[in-house]
Amino acid sequence: MGVGKHQGFTFFIEGCTLGDKVLFEIVSLKKSFGIGRTIDILEKSPYRVDSKCEYSDQCDGCELHNLKYDKQLELKKNIVKNNLKRIGKIEDILVKDTIGMEYPYRYRNKGEFKVGKGYQIGYFKRGTHEIYPVEKSIIQKETVDVVIRLLKEFMMKYKVDGYDRKNKRGIIKNLVVRTTRDNRVMVVIVTSTDKLHHK
């Protein structure tokens, strides 16, 4: 997501990144900011890269992955500085550089996923309550991908429905997976019923 200003008014714009010049449409306006969606990238940022995540255009987990990694770290530092200044009213404070990693993938040890009708397991699509199915995530540990696959296989085999948020029907609502450095895994399945009934 990019941030731009027009006559001092701030817009948060989906589909662009730091340094892009874009044509965008206004999706919504609030009192102090607006939300926009990129229609066309007029000039690509010199910091733009192709995201390695196949879901990055739909989910928020990898929204910075179309930005060079050193710029991601710089941007995160600036976000902290700006929040301290704007929210905390702290002007004169040293914010050290964000510590990066050699391989910025497969590092996250906790994944939270929505489960929906049709055995969908994934994230909400950006700005909606519609589930975007995910089979693998480049920021989660590989073990998380295995758990997602096993839960889906279980649901299909035993005809256990995912939760339909619109009709408030179905059983499995959420999946939470935590992993440790020594490869232990904790799996939490959130249901709408006290017992997991299956045939």
What is each residue range found by the language model?
Residues M1-K199:
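Accessory RNA-recognition modules of RNA-modification enzymes
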